């Protein structure tokens, strides 16, 4: 069963769109480096209170692949620095991990 990870980013007021894009691209590239598949950035266009929220989607073939990707990403000093950077344009994020339901 496919595992889908969604990370909703909540940006700080003030950063330029260019700075936000650079930050997201770096994180996406690191996620891909460590095995995340189908890494895609989305923005809520008609999403109620989530309208305008930037969301990163990534998939893994199964829970084993997801775990390996997460372990590798979180052990990477570049990812750690990106997540802990006080000058990041991202204030907070929420991650949701879901599993597909076959034959539905």
Q: Could you tell me what each predicted segment is?
A:
Residues 34-55, 78-104:
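Glycine-rich beta-strand-turn "strand-cap" elements at beta-sheet edges
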Residues 2-10, 41-74:
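Short, well-ordered beta-strand segments in beta-rich or mixed alpha/beta enzyme
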């Amino acid at each position: 069963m496919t595992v889908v990870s969604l990370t909703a980013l909540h940006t700080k007021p003030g950063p330029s769109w260019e700075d936000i894009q650079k930050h997201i691209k770096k994180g996406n590239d690191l996620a891909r480096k460590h095995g995340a598949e189908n890494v895609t950035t989305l923005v809520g266009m008609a999403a109620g209170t989530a309208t305008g929220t930037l969301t990163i989607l990534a998939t893994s073939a199964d829970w084993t692949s997801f775990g390996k990707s997460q372990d590798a990403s979180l052990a990477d000093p570049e990812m750690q620095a990106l997540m802990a950077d006080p000058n990041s344009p991202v204030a907070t994020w929420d991650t949701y991990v879901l599993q597909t339901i076959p034959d539905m």
